[in-house]
Amino acid sequence: LAGQLHGFVLFGAPLAAGSVSAVLMLSFAAPILQRVPPLRVLVLATLLYVVGAVLATAAPAMGWVLGGTVIRGVAAGLLAGFGLGAIGALFDERERPRVFGLYALIWLLPSVVGPPLNALITDWVGWRWAIGWPAVLVVIGRAMIGRTVSAVPWQPVTGRAGVRIVVGGGVAFALALGSWGSADPSVWGLVALVLGLGTGGAAIALCLIRGLPRNPRPLLAFAVLCAAFFGAFELLSLALIEGLGSTVLVAAGAVTGGLTAWSLVGLRPRPGGRPDPAVLGPGLVLIACVMLLAGMALAGLAGVWTIIAGAIVAGVGMGAAYPLLSSEPFSDDAAPVTVGTLIAFAETAATAWVALLAGGLYSALHGRGWQPNRALELVFALLAVLAATAVAISAGRRTPRRATDAK
């Protein structure tokens, strides 16, 4: 794509632009969702996605691809806030964990089938079709949703929204700064990467705490859990292929195994279970990060199998904790649309931030002469620290049951 459009200077920008624009959109999506009826939101998000897809598909230059990616990111942020808010409004606290468990299963198929299918389409008819064809499925799916969207309870609200544009914009700016820094091999690039990671992480935490000031721990634990899990999966294929000399097929199998474990375990959430699944899940992700470290140290076939097993353990942990930690914030008295936007912001921002941490730090270290295995080991160690942090935050959270017992 970059070669055909003579746009290698902008090659890295579209990779980060979608996440950054989605984070920025989510920082002020709540007031929009509070004032605009659901059907109009659905239509607007769909139109934005189609416009972005058309711009990228018909791009005569790399700047058009960047613009289309930004617009699709805005559409994704708007719809993510709407969708999670709708779950909070339609289902009670007993049903929500089950719904969020199904939510993970729904995107499993696109996550597994999408990349190889797009690779085949690109090889067969070119990258423009690979970018454009999903828009057809999006329009069909949104049309089906539109037939039942009137079931979502909605009343216009004029009160204060959960995420503030100033802080949310700061998150987007920090991610953009860090993305630029990760692509710059100079000392200033490294400074920008570290600065973007530090300020971005602090701004994300500030957004979530301000959004639900009375009980932010479930939301914070959810964000840190997403960062630890998706950070590990960000480098899983790289660890197997570059670090251990395995094949693309093995790497794809490891990713698929982890995502499948997440989806299957998530189908049977255990609210109130012992041990607490919302604490056990991050604990399993921590164990998985240690297994990834061990796999890099073992090398050979033993290392490959250790990393594959670690991916599955991480998936089991995510399946245990994700449905609970993503549904518990709705126990707050805030409007469902506000809470849904905060949950979407937490996952999207944390995933973008950890992609910068994992991918950006690995690139920076590798570019400065580090061996791939040593660079991967350092990143996996940092991800283990994140998983341990998620365990600590989740263990100290105030669940609805604990709140009831205290009364």
Where are the model-predicted features located?
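Membrane-interface helix caps and helix-loop-helix hairpins in membrane proteins
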Residues: M62, W180-P185, P271, G300-L301
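12-transmembrane solute porter fold
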Residues: V9-Q34, L39, L47, G52, ...
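Alpha-helical transmembrane segments
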Residues: A45-Y49, L109-S111, R164-L175, V285-A288
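Hydrophobic transmembrane-helix bundles of small-molecule transporters
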Residues: A119, D123-L236
